[in-house]
């Protein structure tokens, strides 16, 4: 690799290969493209993510088999959302196959940064304070005037909302004078000038073989620049270049006009900031609420004013904790491969269970005839451990993974998984009672469209499960389908109301109250906002719905009348809320826990 400023730099860039067994033609063409690039002898190749289509081990196998020997060790990767969203290892597999997800290196006087704003289990990106601090430190150590080229998966700037905290990212890049940003994700070629920064988004390789060639050059005034061209590799071996952009690597910024002012949420109630993002959901019992963060912070709060009663530091948590029936122990799932049992009054660890894989599902505390069990998924295994001791009661290996949560009626446990099945297991032994196939197709399709993130609901002998495409009500005794519903209640979970009805909330923002017996719609309310994992929580005669955009809306249970909408936060919300002591508690991607008095 060239390491002096006097030598021209030549490298290739591509993105969105979406390798999978179902895309044999793409894999074959990728091998030919990499072979052709090897003949052109670039200094290195950059890949802007969505390397695989689902993050499956077989997809990484196929991708790595397409790389010729001449390019091995010379391709620099960053992950895309398709590489991590359906990955039960929380990026462990990616790092084992392709190395670090964020890093930097120098070549020919240019500093390159591979950045990673992707998040396990989610589509959007989020840099977070930790990511921005890492980036700031990396840039701060450079000599003044060093050209910087960054590449990651999501585009940023006007018209793009793929990164939660893109304003903070763009401010940082502007402050350090970063010159170029390569991105993918949108499968389109665009060139955008943002002050000193030139952002180039690339067409997707999977949509038709395409890659890009970049060379350092000199502008007419002698200043250094980067010439970026689309590279066409024809069947007869011809290589054609079509200029896309010339990126200045020095000079001052053109006037980009006034910056949009930062929006701030309206102050209301209380809020507390944790490290990392709060996206796992809030757990509440009595007068204690538990918030967990992706940085591993666990905080016990007093609902009425947000006073911190205790806090602990564990591994990253992406799903909500759970209390035992007495409210004395709280169980925290962690991507560090453990479930922790903490004393709810002090935060002291009572026991920890090593699941052998990241615990990305929410634990369920299921009360049987004699004992309570903590039921959760880790990797492709379902576990039940004794709530009091943490000893393994039973496990079911060889099933699909899950980021959702099971439910139980005290006799059985009902689950959904990424292998496309809903199942019932005996709570005492783990023996399977029935299974229902929710999705058919190859491994890739099942992984994408299964109930991998379903929070199973139960009421009146009816089990409500959901895939990306719709919801089904199953007979709890037999697994037979009682009725189906066209809207998916997977991301915003279904809520059983206890009177023979349930709330089914779609990702598109429609709340439906339905009869559990036959699925008849009692009323529907359209919120006009997108919902994800946050969804509704019931308090008294109302459901309170937190949207992805941070709005809070009241829905009257009697008739679906909407009222009381307010902006809870300007950050994105994927955190399931809870209500305790008349206070609604929710978390956001910026790490804030918000408390709003409802009475």
Predicted regions and their residues:
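N-terminal active-site segment of His-dependent metallophosphoesterases
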Residues: 1-62, 137
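His/acidic metal-ligating clusters that form di-metal
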Residues: 4, 35-44, 69, 123-198
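Metal-dependent catalytic neighborhoods of phosphoester/phosphodiester hydrolases
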Residues: 24, 49-68, 85-96, 125, ...
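Binuclear metal-dependent phosphoesterase catalytic core
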Residues: 32, 190, 195-264
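Extracytoplasmic beta-rich repeat domains
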Residues: 263-283, 310-324, 351-367, 379, ...
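Short loop/turn segments that connect beta-strands within beta-propeller blades
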Residues: 302-305, 343-346, 386-389, 426-430, ...
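Blade-level signature of beta-propeller repeat domains, shared across WD40, Kelch, NHL, RCC1
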Residues: 568-599
């Amino acid at each position: 690799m060239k390491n002096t400023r006097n030598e021209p730099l030549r490298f290739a860039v591509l993105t969105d290969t979406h390798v999978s067994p179902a895309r044999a033609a793409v894999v074959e063409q990728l091998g030919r493209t990499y072979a052709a690039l090897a003949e052109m002898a670039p200094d290195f190749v950059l890949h802007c993510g969505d390397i695989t289509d689902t993050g499956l081990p077989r997809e990484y196998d196929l991708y790595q088999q397409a790389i010729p020997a001449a390019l091995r060790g010379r391709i620099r990767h960053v992950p895309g959302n398709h590489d991590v969203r359906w990955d039960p290892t929380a990026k462990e597999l990616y790092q084992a196959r392709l190395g670090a997800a964020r890093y930097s290196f120098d070549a020919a006087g240019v500093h390159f940064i591979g950045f990673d704003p992707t998040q396990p289990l989610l589509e959007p990106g989020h840099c977070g304070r930790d990511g921005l601090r890492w980036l700031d430190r990396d840039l701060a150590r450079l000599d003044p005037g060093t050209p910087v080229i960054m590449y990651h998966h999501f585009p940023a700037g006007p018209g793009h909302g793929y990164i939660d905290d893109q304003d903070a990212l763009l401010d940082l890049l502007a402050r350090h004078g970063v010159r170029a940003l390569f991105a993918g994700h949108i499968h389109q070629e665009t060139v955008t000038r943002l002050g000193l920064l030139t952002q180039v988004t690339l067409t997707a390789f999977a949509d038709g073989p395409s890659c890009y060639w970049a060379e350092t050059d000199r502008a007419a005034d002698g200043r250094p620049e980067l010439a970026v061209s689309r590279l066409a590799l024809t069947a007869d071996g011809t290589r054609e270049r079509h200029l896309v952009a010339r990126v200045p690597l020095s000079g001052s910024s053109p006037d980009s006009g006034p910056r949009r002012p930062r929006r701030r949420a309206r102050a209301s109630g209380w809020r507390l900031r944790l490290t990392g993002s709060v996206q796992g959901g809030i757990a509440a019992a009595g007068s204690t609420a538990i918030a967990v963060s992706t940085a591993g912070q666990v905080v016990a709060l007093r609902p009425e004013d947000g006073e911190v009663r205790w806090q602990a530091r564990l591994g990253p948590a992406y799903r909500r904790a759970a209390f035992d029936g007495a409210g004395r122990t709280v169980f925290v799932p962690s991507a560090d491969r453990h479930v922790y049992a903490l004393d709810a009054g002090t935060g002291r660890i009572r026991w920890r269970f090593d699941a052998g894989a990241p615990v990305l599902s929410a634990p369920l505390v299921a009360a049987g005839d004699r004992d309570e069990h903590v039921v959760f998924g880790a990797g492709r295994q379902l576990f039940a451990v004794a709530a009091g001791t943490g000893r393994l009661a039973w496990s079911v290996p060889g099933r699909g993974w899950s980021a959702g949560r099971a439910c139980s009626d005290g006799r059985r446990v009902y689950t959904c998984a990424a292998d496309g099945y809903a199942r019932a297991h005996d709570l005492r032994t783990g023996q399977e009672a029935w299974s229902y196939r929710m999705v058919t197709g190859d491994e890739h399709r099942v992984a994408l469209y299964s109930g991998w993130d379903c929070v199973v609901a139960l009421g009146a002998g009816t089990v409500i499960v959901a895939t990306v495409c719709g919801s089904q009500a199953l007979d709890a005794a037999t697994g037979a389908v009682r009725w189906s519903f066209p809207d998916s209640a997977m991301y915003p979970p279904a809520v059983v109301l206890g009177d023979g009805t349930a709330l089914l909330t779609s990702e598109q923002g429609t709340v439906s109250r339905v009869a559990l017996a036959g699925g008849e719609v009692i009323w529907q309310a359209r919120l006009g906002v997108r919902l994800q994992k946050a969804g509704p929580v019931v308090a008294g005669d109302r459901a309170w719905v937190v949207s992805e955009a941070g709005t809070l809306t009241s829905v009257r249970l009697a008739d679906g009348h909407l009222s009381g909408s307010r902006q809870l936060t300007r950050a994105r919300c994927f955190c399931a809320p809870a209500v305790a002591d008349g206070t609604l508690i929710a978390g956001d991607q910026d790490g804030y826990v918000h408390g709003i008095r409802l009475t």
